Amino acid sequence: MGLDPDTEAAAITAALRTLAPELTTVPMIKTSRPFYGARVGDLRATAAGWLRAHRDATPAELAELADRLWTTGVREEQLVACFLLARDRAALAATGLDRVRAWTALLDNWETTDQLGMNVLGPLVALDPGRRLGLLEELAGDPHPWARRLALVAATRLARADDPARWWPAVAELLLRLAGDRQAALPKASSWVLRSWLEPCPDQVAAFVDANAGRLPAVAVRETRAKLATGTKRPPRPPGGRRPAIAGGRP
């Protein structure tokens, strides 16, 4: 007998309520979504425990369970959905891009957006960038600002794909397309993308930042140049003084 995703989703919901039993809309982060207030570490442990207890679950069943959890719109259930898929590569591969695209309708804060991008969409696109990069381009043009942020966060994981240098030009175009966007903390997300790509493509990223310093967000230019120079996004603070400013970018 196969796994019933509705029953399993209800069991996970019950477990999450015991971690933080009062459903609340008072935000830990700026969100209109309900949440229980459970810690991220407990959510990861919940996902890991479920997988240990259901080793016979098929990839399709796990993908369906993740969908049930995500579409509740509750923070903890959405994050458990991400962590389930992140721990099971076959289930991730069984999660269609159309399904993840539909999930973006429930994004309204940086936490769930970033967890979806890091754990699900980014790794999913990295499995087959040639066929799947188009979704990031589509999301970059979405009127929903959190969908646009999702495109950038997912691009950080493409730096781990096979032959990453092949995909850098597409990521660079994505960055330029969103360079002037100030919604959903997109300037900081641009910095994250650039710094993620320094490991596989340091020369290309450095040249890109130099060539486009006037277009890219100032924080992205500053933090990327700092990481190139020091290994961290923040320049070292001199004894008794402020950290030096790094030239480039818009004021």
PLM regions and their residue ranges:
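Alpha-helical scaffold domains
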Residues: 1-251
